[in-house]
Amino acid sequence: WVSGTYNWATMYSRIRSCNVALENIRTATFDNQALKDRLSGEAHFLRGYYYHQLVRYYGGVPLIDKSYGLNEDYTIARSSFEDCVGFIVKECDSAIALLDGVSMAKGRATANAALALKSRILLYAASDMHDIPTLQSKTSFLSGYAAPEVLGYTSGDRIARWQAAKVAAKAVMDAAGSGYKLGLNAPVTTEQGKNNYMSIAMGGGSKAPGVDASAASEIIFGR
């Protein structure tokens, strides 16, 4: 399923909004530092999220971390996949630091949401799909591609990438709680399994019989 909200132009429009917000927050004249930190944390999370969406669909993309004026040069080269992943992780780390311990209303970015986003992008980055030597050993598709670095890692330690993904996944599970009725040591009936799945997928909001409304507590980021 591909939504129009994930297209290139829309994502960069939202990234620009984040850039403008961060620039304005840095020069804001009000004295509420806690509010400045919270707003900055949300903007960093959203900027990382939008870049993560772009990387999912396009691989390496131009990294833009400032707002542009009308007379500036807009011809910006695509960054490597590795650089994009690094940028997203940095955005998540900034959001985690700024939002840690902050109680947020439903639908707003949280430290746990940033931990989850970091875990997701590092898991994607560690996969075979983004290790160019592995791909080249399995298919000739990339043999004529001039810029493999925008599709994945052309070198580096794969084990280290998996380890980073593992550490990030453990961090979000420890912070947010995990395992809603998914204990593999306690099998359930097929019907109960369906109800558990619906409860998780719908966040407890489904009206289907048997759905557990308490599953809403498992939602890390939603609207």
Predicted regions and their residues:
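Hydrophobic packing residues in well-ordered alpha-helices of helical domains and bundles
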Residues: 11, 36, 41, 114, ...
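Conserved, well-structured interaction surfaces
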Residues: 1-58, 72-108
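TPR/Sel1-like alpha-solenoid repeat signature
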Residues: 44-47, 115-121
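An aromatic- and glycine-enriched ligand-binding surface/loop that stacks and positions planar moieties
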Residues: 59-61, 93, 112, 120-223
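Short linear capping/connector segments at secondary-structure termini
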Residues: 66-72
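Short glycine/serine- and small hydrophobic-enriched flexible loop segments
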Residues: 23, 52-56, 117-127
